[in-house]
Amino acid sequence: MDVAAPMEVVATAGHVDHGKSALLKRLTGMEPDRWDEERRRGLTIDLGYVWTDLEVTGDETVTVAFVDVPGHDGYLTNMLSGVGVVDQVLFVVAADDGWSAQSEEHLEILDLLGRRGVVAAVTKAELAGPERTAEVVDDVGRRFAGTSLEDSPVLAVDSLSGQGIDELRAALANRLSGWHGGTVRDAATRLWIDRSFTVTGAGTIVTGLLTAGHLAVGDEVIVAPHGRPARVRGLQSLGCSVASVAGVSRVAVNLAGLDHTQVERGNVLLTPDRASVSSRVPGLATSAIDVQLRALPHSPIGRRGAWHLHVGTATTTVEMHPLLGDIEPGSHGHARLVLADPLAIRLGDRFVLRDAGRRRTVGGGVVLDPAPVQRPRGAERRLTHALVLDELAAAGDLPTTIVALVDAHGGRRSHEELASLLGGVAVLDTALAEIAELTAIAGQVVRREQIAPWTDAIVAAAVEAPAEHAVQRAALVAAAADRGCPRELAPALIDNLVAERKLASYGGRLVHQDHEPTYLEAREVRRTGLLAALEADPLQPPDPAEATARADIPSFEVQELLDEGVVVSCEALLFTRSAIEGAAAQLRDGPGRDGRSFTAAEARDTWNTTRRAAMPLLEHLRTTGVTSFDGTHHRVIDP
């Protein structure tokens, strides 16, 4: 099987019966209406797909796949599923009818989505006559002014006679040549699903637009938002089986491991490296989004209303929570949208908002944060959050976007979450290296200015501690927490201070750098005191608690001596290393000389100690390979 050739994907738009399907049939030689009912009624009901090659130059062509959308207002949800994922549009207006109701609403929708107008075709030119056609061409150009389609050339065509079709093909080829490239094909894999069905012998088939990334036969995939895993059994693009396909492409995917009833329009196919099983990490599913919203001139947008969100091929009802009051007609604002159904929404996705009661498009916008913090309460907090969202909306580059995303969460955000938002760990870490305001620590990305008071609190607590003693780590964590530091971040901040030599670590406890000479001197006094107590009668050591209390030595400093091998713990007793070595030598020169065996009582008498000390000593010598024991007698092992 081959690798699918690159293609451009274009959606149609325009009023019902203005000749969209007929124009595509003339351009491609293919029938876009799939259903018998559509052909019988001459009315597009659902999405149709056709394709063709357009000549750019004598030896260069561009493959174009067309998504034919319905123009009837009763099927607007289907229309939105088509244009919701396609960046480029062929806008159609009939010369005889001229600009009509759905022409206007389709233009509003396309402008809200920021779609690029490739070409506008004024159809039925011969039926309307040259004068009427010229009027409509001029009118379409005027109506496009100030919208995302304003640079679209407007051409007169007639699908029946073929008038203007060659010019339209040339304009399409010229406008589409090289429009998409490596940036889209190298991005995170994402396929918006618009159909799911079953084929006998093959199983589940889904179709949709691969908007970015790659898919290959054998790939493991996840269907979002429910997170069901599947495997790519086969791929088809433009009617041919292929081994792999890259965005942007229309593609049919044969999925193994899923029934077709488990997949529906509005689901998204993701690769596992871009989909987290955590509900807090965007890409797989989200139930709330912060958005920038533009209200159309005829409609205010507020809390009250039956709002329907359309994004990608998906739709759901939403609760509307404007941040700073209702958004007036023709103005912009920010809002929190709470989704009735989780959707696989990402940063930067564009959407359309419709009033279900009035069956009217009222606005649209862009997703600024698909994993927002808890909705801010109080006017001051809402204003602060709105300013941060302004910063996000205005961000023109990746570093500014990252800073704004961190600010949107109060100056601290999960590294995993940011990586998912931005397309991967490598993308995030490369950008963070150039952002002076932020640092990554303990799985979080944090504003440096926020960290400063936390580190100051840690250092201050270390300074205030007695110079002769090290501070427990928990005490420094508590000091940082009192200044608002999350407890999960404080240990990493302490480790950073140790690495910067502002703190020194001894046995897991901390000492301020200025206290270190005093501490080391006091520690040596304590160590010497303990060793003296143990060596006063080396093989008859004192009670450990009594000895450590007398030396005023904390347990972690005792552990340091144990770790260094200066002191040895034999069950509940402490011996110096030299005492252990001396005990072994006495056995070797005494009852165990020349390979003789001996009893525990003989060892005890040789050492002139008690059974309390002798038995732990003998067990230590056995476990360290100095002696052996057969159940009754001990024997010194030759070194």
Model-derived features with residue positions:
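Conserved G1/Walker A P-loop phosphate-binding module
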Residues: 1-69
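C-terminal non-catalytic scaffold/interaction domains in large multidomain proteins
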Residues: 229, 371-639
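Conserved nucleotide-binding/hydrolysis micro-motifs of P-loop NTPases
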Residues: 72-73, 96-100, 115, 124-129, ...
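G-domain G4 guanine-recognition motif of GTPases
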Residues: 94-96, 118-135, 155-163, 168, ...
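P-loop/Walker A NTP-binding module and the surrounding RecA-like catalytic core of P-loop NTPases
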Residues: 10-14, 18-26, 74-79, 98-101, ...
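Beta-strand/loop-dominated core regions that host nucleotide or nucleotide-derived cofactor-binding catalytic loops
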Residues: 220-394, 491
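Conserved catalytic-core segments of large NTP-driven translation/proteostasis enzymes
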Residues: 2, 125, 142-297
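Conserved Switch II/interswitch segment of TRAFAC-class P-loop GTPases
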Residues: 62, 69-74, 83-135
